[in-house]
């Protein structure tokens, strides 16, 4: 009898990705943080009802918050709780990590971007990127490189036939 593989697939824990952030910014470093969520938000995230494409991270009073993230409430969510899909959510990080982030974003042109939202065991985690904005010519160079990689792959595929 064949042994079943109990390991989950690599991408199965991902809830949402922010592809726009990698296009708009140079990501220098990635940091993992927990999130302070309400019960209906966890249920909606289990259904994959999240969008982080317009989200950003900001610091206020030594704490980190994510804004612009949308978690669409489920239809059968609790009736006694008013669900605000775009509320500002607090990020859970150690004091050392928060101080490190604050020092890094105070430099010229640095910001924090939400990159992905995923499950780590039973906890929702968000991956934050310490980022620097791209200029238009940088974006064009990236597009040119991507097109060149596609063309190379096509040529290699056709030459193997």
Swiss-Prot record:
Say which domain of life the source belongs to.
Answer: Bacteria
Note the Gene3D superfamilies from the entry. 2.40.280.10
Name the chain's protein: SsrA-binding protein
Signal peptide region? none
What organism does this protein naturally occur in? Vibrio vulnificus (strain YJ016)
Q: Which family does it belong to?
A: Belongs to the SmpB family.
Q: What is its main location?
A: cytoplasm
Job description of the protein: Required for rescue of stalled ribosomes mediated by trans-translation. Binds to transfer-messenger RNA (tmRNA), required for stable association of tmRNA with ribosomes. tmRNA and SmpB together mimic tRNA shape, replacing the anticodon stem-loop with SmpB. tmRNA is encoded by the ssrA gene; the 2 termini fold to resemble tRNA(Ala) and it encodes a 'tag peptide', a short internal open reading frame. During trans-translation Ala-aminoacylated tmRNA acts like a tRNA, entering the A-site of stalled ribosomes, displacing the stalled mRNA.
Q: Which Gene Ontology BP terms does the record give?
A: trans-translation
Recorded name of the encoding gene: smpB
List, alphabetically, the InterPro entries matched: SmpB, SsrA-bd_prot, SsrA-bd_prot_CS
Q: Which UniProt keywords apply?
A: Cytoplasm, RNA-binding
Q: Where in the cell is it found?
A: Cytoplasm
Identify the GO cellular component terms for this protein.
Answer: cytosol
Single GO term (MF)? RNA binding
């Amino acid at each position: 009898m064949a042994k079943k593989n109990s390991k989950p697939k690599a991408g199965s824990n991902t809830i949402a990705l922010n592809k726009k952030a990698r296009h708009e910014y140079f990501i220098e470093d990635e940091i993992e943080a927990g999130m302070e969520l309400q019960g209906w938000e966890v249920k909606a995230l289990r259904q994959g009802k999240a969008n982080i494409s317009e989200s950003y991270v900001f610091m206020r009073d030594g704490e980190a918050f994510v804004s612009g993230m949308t978690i669409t409430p489920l239809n059968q969510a609790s009736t006694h709780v008013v669900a605000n899909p775009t509320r500002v959510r607090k990020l859970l990080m150690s004091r050392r990590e928060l101080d490190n982030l604050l020092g890094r974003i105070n430099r010229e042109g640095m910001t924090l971007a939400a990159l992905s939202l995923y499950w780590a065991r039973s906890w929702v985690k968000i991956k934050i990127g310490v980022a620097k904005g791209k200029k238009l010519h940088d974006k064009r160079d990236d597009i040119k490189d991507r097109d060149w990689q596609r063309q190379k792959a096509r040529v290699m595929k056709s030459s193997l036939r």
